[in-house]
Amino acid sequence: MVCSITLLKVRSKRHLLSYLGVVGVGIAGLCIYRSVWGSRPFLERLARADSLIAQERKGAALRGLARMVGHARESSQYLSIAKRQMELSASAAALRTLQRGIRRSADDGRLAALVIHLLLREARFEEAISYVPRVVHKGYESIGAEALIKAALIGSRTGGDSPSRGSFHSERAEHVPEEPVEFSQVQGGRDQAHVTAFPLDRGEEQFRVEPSPPIRHTTGIALARIAPALWLAAFGVTGMHAFLQNAACAYARVGELHAAFRLYSRILGTEAPENTAFWATVAYDAGQFSLVFELLPISLARADLFGTYSAASTHARTHLLLAADAAFDGGDRARARAFWYAYVDRFPGTSTHALYNLALTAPHAQERVRMLAQCVEGDKTYYPAVACYARESIAFRAAHRQRDSVTELLSERGVYSVQMEQEHFLSPHFPVEARSLLAELAQEAMHGRADVRFALEYFRFCYPAQKRLQGSRGALWQLLEVFPVDTQVRRYARWFFFRIGEYESAFGLSDAGGGPEDAFYRALAAASRTGRVESILGGLVEATRAVEARSAAFANIAIVLERMGKKTAAAEHFVLAADEATRESVRQLQKEAGEGEAEEHPRARPAAGKAQRWREWYQRAGQLLQQQGKTVAARALLQRAQAR
């Protein structure tokens, strides 16, 4: 009995194993069948749908295709169904099919590209751009670019902000600002310099060679935050240079200037760029000056071909000024002046900037005044030229008054030495009377029709420049009454009152636009009320944040520390003040004045005046260290003061 039971168990196990083996073989066979023949029912249904389409049985074909969607497993199957639905003009059904396919195969760019195509056909731009990230780096970037561009076009026409969502950001584009990008618009590293004068020594102004304005060739189309990859894809498909230029803009806007410049190499060597001035600007911003000069003949030739009022002429004007900037920045002043002269000859009606730059780089006073006079006669509202012209007039009169009596007597008798003849023939001629010009412009400014700086310049011409204080307080208070909240007027008035010892009036103007200088004057006012000199230190430290006031702030901190008996700290701050002033003015002289021109160049005079301050500050620091017994450091500073 026991033996029979054991035998039964063994047989049961054998039957079970045999059964499991048969089931396993069946499952494997089914898997192989599905992998090899599983698509045959789908292909048969697809053939049936094609037959119905051929028989023009549209309704039956669409119903069959709709049922097939539930049996589709691969992205190619969804594409096959959607293609036939589109052929039957059932775009809505095709869109649903593709969207279902995307949910199943999210990484297939073909499905998203076809969805974008369908949505663009129906002008559903906001929905289309939401699919753009799915086509990038999938070989379908061009359709994504088309969606973003069309959305931006519609947004600009309707006053909207499209694309408002879904604008694709690549690894670079995620830093692109919210402002719109415009067709062929350069956003380079240089600011447009409408104002070229800035405060120097609290009331004096220094002038600089003016850079050309950045190129702006726009069509008024707001194209926001589109990634460079999309622009490049559009360029690859169409070959249109505008797309390549906008890719360069996208890189430039996030500071990738060299990446923007490298895009120029995509233009074939046998093909000239459509906008040479654009690529010249990109090259300038990337520091590649050679391309600026290389493309200039093309810009000028196109301007000659298409005429004065063409876009090519506008590009040529910008390009010529840009070439002058590149030459000047490269240290070739003669070449820069040649470009500015060429600009004046070619475009005489728009040559204010070029004439002004020629004046600042002129080799002698006569040439400088002649260029300034042309500039003023062409545009008397251009403040930098008018201010320089007036100051040259003041300097010439002051020099003429200093002539000795013997020279005056000889000139009256008609007797001239070689030096007198040279001075006579090189003396500047002022065709416009500076005082009357400034008086006219000051009146215009008082009525809000001209730059307020003309009113300040006229005040400076009448009082500080003439070393005359009588009536100056009343004239300045009159300006403050006309311009009670103007920052420039309040700052100048505060400086002037301090200069003449009207401290209470200066303290009353402590609020002049905010910033470190206001903190400095508030600290002075507090110190004058409390009598504690150390209370001024906080304001002075804050004033060091302003670049133009840094050397003066360090010097004032040193003076306060010396009064407090902290001589070592005072010496350190005197050195900081001298070093800061040295860096600022030496750079200025090296760039703006060539060898042998220091006395002639308008920027050399204030810089030369600062040299005395350097010596005084280094010398005072050395004296303080000597008092502390630090003879080695003191001797080094005193030698530095003598060397400069």
Swiss-Prot record:
Chief subcellular location: membrane
Localization terms from the record: Membrane
Membrane spanning residue stretches: 16-38
GO cellular component: membrane
Membrane topology: Single-pass membrane protein
Region (Disordered): 586-613
Highest taxon in the source lineage: Bacteria
Gene3D superfamilies: Tetratricopeptide repeat domain (1.25.40.10)
Key words of the record: Membrane, Transmembrane, Transmembrane helix
Basic and acidic residues composition bias: residue spans: 586-603
Record has Glycoprotein as a keyword: no
Protein name: Uncharacterized protein TP_1014
Protein's organism: Treponema pallidum (strain Nichols)
Organism placement in taxonomy: Bacteria, Pseudomonadati, Spirochaetota, Spirochaetia, Spirochaetales
